[in-house]
């Protein structure tokens, strides 16, 4: 099992979602779309639809950094052949978030706010509140707040409700500056205003791997973790962990330590 997440470092974590954008916001909003998430666990193949993805999370505890959760990341099954692990009984790729994130994010999914397949006409004339109201029947006599509370069984003290309020999505004042935008594009706009890295913010990459194997007929497990903290909003952990391996490979090619050509994966010596 392999888990990875681009998160916000504890010292820069100052919102209820425990999250800020440390890479492409659009990819975060659309995460999980484009097909069922698939993996195999104890020789059983499992498939999870996008609609159910954020309801099916796994709890993780990372030493010194606390509680996290993970959801299945796209199709893990194809990596069996890539890594020559065709007979493996468990292979799972997961995306890490802080505990509680997915439960709140699931509201956006269920309402249809992450849909990028159609455009909302005259979206540039809408307020945030009108955007949220768009996903409920126009003849509803209840307020948009009441509709959401009823649909998702929330009350004023619920942390999920507090997370929604923090985003100011019920505002009549805040306007959407996007013309004929998709629901996902509008949601991205709202979230970027709330979750962008501020000056001197530090991001955090968390990687957690579980390796199970049998030796001398005895089952063993090895856990491997890596946590990388960025320097600031520019020199991020995301930039380092993505960019440095590529730079190392480029130098190895120039120094002829890597002699293969073309697009190659790091799966062989």
Question: Predicted regions span which residues?
Answer:
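C-terminal catalytic/substrate-binding lobe primarily of soluble NAD(P)-dependent oxidoreductases
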Residues: 2-269
């Amino acid at each position: 099992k392999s888990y990875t997440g681009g998160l916000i470092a504890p010292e820069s974590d100052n919102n209820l979602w425990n999250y800020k954008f440390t890479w492409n916001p659009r990819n975060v909003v659309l995460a999980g779309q484009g097909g069922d998430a698939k993996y195999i666990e104890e020789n059983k193949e499992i498939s999870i639809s996008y609609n159910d993805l954020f309801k099916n999370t796994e709890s993780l505890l990372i030493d010194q950094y606390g509680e996290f959760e993970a959801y299945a990341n796209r199709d893990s099954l194809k990596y069996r052949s890539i890594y020559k692990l065709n007979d493996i009984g468990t292979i799972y790729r997961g995306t890490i978030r802080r505990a509680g994130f997915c439960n709140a994010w699931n509201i956006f999914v269920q309402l249809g706010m992450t849909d990028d397949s159609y455009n909302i006409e005259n979206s540039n004339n809408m307020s945030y509140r009108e955007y949220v109201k768009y996903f409920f029947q126009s003849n509803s006599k209840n307020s948009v707040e009441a509709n959401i509370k009823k649909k998702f069984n929330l009350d004023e003290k619920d942390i999920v409700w507090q997370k929604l309020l923090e985003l100011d999505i019920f505002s009549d004042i805040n306007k959407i500056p996007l013309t004929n935008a998709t629901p996902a594009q509008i949601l991205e706009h709202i979230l970027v205003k709330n979750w962008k890295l501020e000056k001197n913010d530090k991001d955090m990459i968390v990687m957690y791997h579980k390796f199970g194997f049998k030796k001398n007929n005895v089952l063993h497990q090895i856990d491997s973790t890596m946590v990388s903290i960025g320097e600031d909003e520019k020199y991020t952990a995301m930039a380092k962990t993505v960019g440095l391996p590529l730079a190392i490979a480029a130098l190895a090619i120039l120094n002829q330590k890597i002699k293969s050509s073309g697009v190659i994966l790091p799966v062989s010596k």
